[in-house]
A protein has these predicted regions:
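Active-site micro-motifs of SAM-dependent methyltransferase domains
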Residues: 34, 61, 106, 130-131
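Active-site loop/oxyanion-hole signature of alpha/beta-hydrolase fold enzymes
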Residues: 50, 56-98
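Conserved alpha/beta-hydrolase "nucleophile elbow" surrounding the catalytic nucleophile
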Residues: 97, 101-106
């Protein structure tokens, strides 16, 4: 796994080079408990199928990426979209990426596109947060019970290592 310095933090990422000329760079944005490794083989398969350069990274505090020193706020997705994502794109030297985001990553992609409409080539999102439904909040409350009563922490630790508890509680407490 590679690492890159972005806004004073070391972020892990994988970079799949383009295999065809003139293709955009795809940038994958993970969900609320995700990271590079949780995408499994999808990035590699998508890069091969499209011929595009594809970059997938773990946001600050996820996977093998360094965490923010300060606690998460309810505006964490705005911070990612308006500060960290532009800094990452600049650090990687990407011009007009095509953003592909799932859940939190989809919301971050949409916020980024709204804040910087000329920056992305396009945005594709899966299950972004446009509004919060009661059923979503109930599911997140249920996830806390699963966290406390099953091996969920051990399973997440395969990807988030020593940061696992913070990753889960930041996600769960924010909602």
């Amino acid at each position: 796994m590679k690492h890159i310095a972005v806004s004073g933090l070391k972020l892990e990422y994988r970079d799949f080079p383009a295999t065809a000329e003139g293709r955009p760079t795809l940038l994958l944005l993970h969900e609320g408990l995700g990271c590079v490794t949780m995408w499994r083989h999808f990035p590699e398969k998508l890069a091969a199928a499209t011929g595009c350069r594809l970059i997938v990274w773990s946001r600050a505090g996820y996977g093998g990426s360094e965490a923010y020193a300060e606690p998460r706020t309810p505006r964490y997705m705005h911070r990612e979209a308006e500060e960290m994502l532009p800094a990452l794109i600049a650090a990687l030297g990407i011009a007009r990426p095509l953003l592909i985001g799932h859940s939190d990553g989809g919301t971050i992609a949409l916020i980024f596109a709204g804040a910087f409409p000329e920056a992305p080539l396009g945005v594709a999102v899966m299950a972004p947060h446009e509004f919060v439904e009661d059923v979503t909040l109930a599911g997140i409350r249920d996830a806390r019970v699963v966290w406390k009563t099953t091996d969920m922490a051990q399973k997440l630790a395969r990807c988030h290592h020593a940061q696992t508890e913070r990753v889960f509680l930041d996600w769960n407490d924010t909602w």
